[in-house]
Design a protein with these regions (language model features):
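A structural signal for multi-pass alpha-helical bundles of membrane permease subunits
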Residues: 3-281
């Protein structure tokens, strides 16, 4: 081996160690302990697929799956649509275009925990910002229907910026010549959007949807700080249920099984989405 390739491998070594230590090892170790019943003070007992069978007979787990899918579908749909609208507006020539783009991406830099606490003060029933402005008491955090909506709104406030950035980049990659040729046929902006902009933007749009779906399935800080999974279990998403099983009840084997079921559901959802897109196009 030549000295230069060795130097390249040497520089890659820290990154490889980091990935092995914080991604590969936790993944396989989590899969390993999901086949065990782990009790403190006694030896771990191998139970095979017992934790996974338990998952399908656990009403709280089934509820967490339903809540997670409602959250993912609701939040991703709103974020992609808002992100697209904002990208279309920000892509127009304007003297304040740079300032507007900067302001639109600021929420992305906030930590999710801070966002959760921020919206807790906004949605608080007694003295909260929204109820104070409206002059009525809406049970944002104590009603199951409102609570999930509050979590989706908080998540949307932060992650719409992500969709906006990706879709804005996609819009800017469309050649001007295409619009010039389209303008010779029609001046109708709606037709140009549906027949020119949207088809060109399709790969970027799919990328934004897939990235947001993957992240939305892993949501934890915002619902945890905003509602703690309540009222009842109305905002208990799967990552929170896995955290509760592991950190509150110290059932680490079952907690790992919940996490891997989340991973499996994400893969199924993405495969289904890919097939739907292929059939549509």
């Amino acid at each position: 081996m030549q000295p230069r390739p060795r130097i390249k491998l040497l520089f890659l070594l820290p990154a490889a160690i980091w990935v092995l230590a914080w991604t590969v090892f936790p993944f396989f170790y989590g899969l390993y302990i999901s086949f065990f019943q782990i009790d403190f003070g006694s030896e771990d007992r191998f139970i095979g697929l017992g934790n996974y069978y338990r998952f399908f007979s656990d009403n709280n787990a089934i509820n967490a799956v339903e809540v997670t899918f409602l959250f993912v579908i609701g939040s991703v749909a709103v974020q992609v649509i808002l992100g697209l609208l904002l990208a279309l507006m920000a892509n127009r020539p304007s003297t304040t275009r740079g300032l507007v783009r900067t302001l639109l991406i600021l929420p992305l830099f906030a930590t999710p925990v801070a966002v959760g606490f921020l919206f807790f003060t906004i949605f608080y029933e007694e003295g909260g910002l929204i109820n104070g402005l409206l002059g009525i008491k809406i049970p944002w955090l104590s009603s199951p229907g409102y609570a999930l909506s509050a979590v989706i709104i908080a998540d949307t406030w932060q992650w719409t910026s992500f969709c906006f950035l990706i879709l804005l980049a996609g819009l800017q990659s469309i050649p001007d010549e295409v619009y010039e040729a389209a303008s010779l046929e029609t001046r109708n902006r709606r037709k140009i959007f549906w027949h020119i902009t949207l088809p060109y933007l399709q790969p970027t749009l799919v990328l934004a949807i897939l990235l947001r779906i993957t992240e939305a399935f892993k949501v934890f800080p915002i619902p945890y700080t905003l509602t703690r999974g309540g009222p009842g279990n109305s905002t208990l998403v799967m990552p929170m249920y896995a955290h509760r099983a592991g950190m509150r009840y110290f059932d680490f084997g079952y907690s790992s099984a919940i996490s891997f079921m989340t991973f499996i559901l994400v893969m199924i959802f993405i495969i289904f989405l890919f097939r739907s897109i292929r059939q549509a196009y």
